[in-house]
């Protein structure tokens, strides 16, 4: 009891000292900064600044605040200054004129451990290592040719999902199936076949648990991310212990994967998987970068999390919107079934002919960007945006959700209307700033070309092979569209639907 009270007193004293120092520094900075040179923003509370205004779904809270304070807004999140960009014009200035200044990444407590000290591509600091690893990803791992080489894997896994639905009793949990599809595809592409990790095996089940736990860690807010000086609290609140346990299991699995790929007795598959490619690069003395085993594992964490999460979220949100908009769904089914008539299934080579399906995917990415705030950036140098001075080490949030629902750009922005793209050349590849589901510039998502083919292939086959209904007693207006908090925003309530086989497709 005495030791507990002593710890509480010590904690309180340390916290008060930190608060006092923070206020002194803040006051000193305020005196030297002309208020007219910084962007507008909401009033701050002592110590926490504007943290209380983030809410459970920050992209929504920040959109409301930007409506009041403007598309370029400065906030104070704990001890961290944060800039929020909420319009296409402001995003264009950031990415076109100041992309280098905005190319940094903030330090995150959990990410440092789970990415092997930022050995990944997503959160690595801007610099030589990041440039070389991005080059590897773009040229070796995620090039158009490489993505195309994995077409058979995507085709097989989509067929397995379709067969599972056909055998299942209704309703089917499409959220769970989409996650399983994405996980299976990314694991086969990244690792090939790992002994002992067959479907239904205990080892695979444990890996999936590790994978989901790792995702949860990345999506959880940590006090150290807003008060870096208080990172020591994680030693006492259980976070560091749980983080170490998760990392130990993740590291053990990745070590097994690498060791098996290095085993000379391992049978070689027809296609080089991502681990094979990274080990080949590691062993090439002519490469400009020498990859360590830790670097390889950090890159694999990026590939695993980014590749699976995005595809799952987009596929589920798209199907949910189709269920809420039956006329759109019927039009999409009609297109798929007319064009694919006689084939029995949709192949990737068919996707280019499915024009309406492309519009549906665009509209889904506009209305439900998988990462609505993108991955936060950090300024690496001072710059001026729209006449406002932005200091170095400012955290930057690009509110892709707000940009893509801006009523000044989009008519009836919250309606799901694929037809809006019939007379618009706007795309999602980072060149058009009216919608930025994959970001833009140097730090744009390199895995975009990896996710989109799987989403299109899965969606087209679901529409070809089945007629879809909501569970008995539900109508379109009853379908919940609430978002779950996280870096990637998933549908909070699983999407459960009734699937009836399309007999014409089965006969084909």
Curated annotation (Swiss-Prot):
One of its GO terms (biological process) is alkaloid biosynthetic process. Pathway: Alkaloid biosynthesis. Keywords: Heme, Iron, Membrane, Metal-binding, Monooxygenase, Oxidoreductase, Transmembrane, Transmembrane helix. Its EC number is 1.14.14.190. The chain crosses the membrane at residues 5-25. It is a single-pass membrane protein. The keyword S-adenosyl-L-methionine does not apply. This is Strychnine-11-hydroxylase. It comes from Strychnos nux-vomica.
